[in-house]
Design a protein with these regions (language model features):
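N-terminal Rossmann-like NAD(P)+-binding domain of SDR-like oxidoreductases, especially those catalyzing
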Residues: 1-77
Length: 77
């Protein structure tokens, strides 16, 4: 089963990408700081991590804990 990271996955477009990936059978991790999205938008089958893509320590930890096949960078600002 592929594993995907979606940054900005709590936003409008990101949440739809997450839903499609879950429907395709992916394990999905969402990284979002909720500055433009809402946690309620995140598919409950996905793992949600609240944080910023600018936090290099957090991003390094996430990549150390998961072996991603795909990364969808949809975070903005």
């Amino acid at each position: 089963m592929p594993t995907s990271l979606v940054t900005g996955g709590a936003g409008f477009i990101g949440a739809h990408v997450v839903n499609d990936l879950v429907a395709l059978g992916h394990d999905v991790v969402v990284l979002d700081d909720l500055s433009g999205g809402f946690e309620d938008n995140v598919n409950p089958a996905a793992t949600f991590i609240e944080g910023s893509v600018t936090d290099h320590v957090l991003v390094s930890r996430i990549f150390g804990e998961h072996d991603f096949d795909y990364v969808y960078h949809l975070a903005a600002y």
